[in-house]
């Protein structure tokens, strides 16, 4: 049995899932981030599955999504990368709340996410050493190279606009995994990708695995793919995530 309920932590709506009857007890805790234009409720099946396996799972609502959506879809579309940054920046305050409440068992903290959430996971892992295990589903940690084609804030078709785009997105250099791979792979890491993904190409994950391999950083990395699967989570992907955290967290 699983209990799920809504909370607001530091002004951020979250969905809280825990094994029935254990909500007030210290538990290994996973923070899960949902995808772009989605919501914490849509991805609540991750919370259910992780809670059923014995984990407390906290699903924060990304800025401009779900309960935080202002109704302006065009504005949200132009702020994908700002939302990613906000996810990463907001995580410590949420984590610290549950740590202060004594609800995290033995500092056993995991981060997980899909799509935008997978990208959030990778960016968070290289910034926050208190993360003990991380799982990225159909994500990428190479923000600057992906940003011109994945939800850029505006079309950049001239040298001037391309330069402006690069300037506007320069903040991503401090968040992406480039030059921080040792911090990404120093603890258990799961990378999952559907090979037919046409939104965030599987090559993003392949590139990461190649780069980690070149630096002999694959000892704690698990790389899983599924053929003919596009930009979506499968039942087997969810199972892989549960197995990963059950073993390493």
What do the PLM-derived regions correspond to, one by one?
Residues 94-151:
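Primarily recognizes the serine-hydrolase "nucleophile elbow" in alpha/beta-hydrolase
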Residues 25-35:
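Short beta-strand element of the alpha/beta-hydrolase
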Residues 206, 213-249:
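C-terminal catalytic histidine-bearing segment of alpha/beta-hydrolase fold enzymes
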Residues 49-73:
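Conserved alpha/beta-hydrolase
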Residues 1-25:
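N-terminal cap/lid segment of alpha/beta-hydrolase-fold proteins
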Residues 78-101:
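Alpha/beta-hydrolase active-site loop
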Residues 36-48:
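The serine-hydrolase catalytic nucleophile loop
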Residues 145-206, 210:
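The feature captures the conserved acid-bearing segment of alpha/beta-hydrolase catalytic domains
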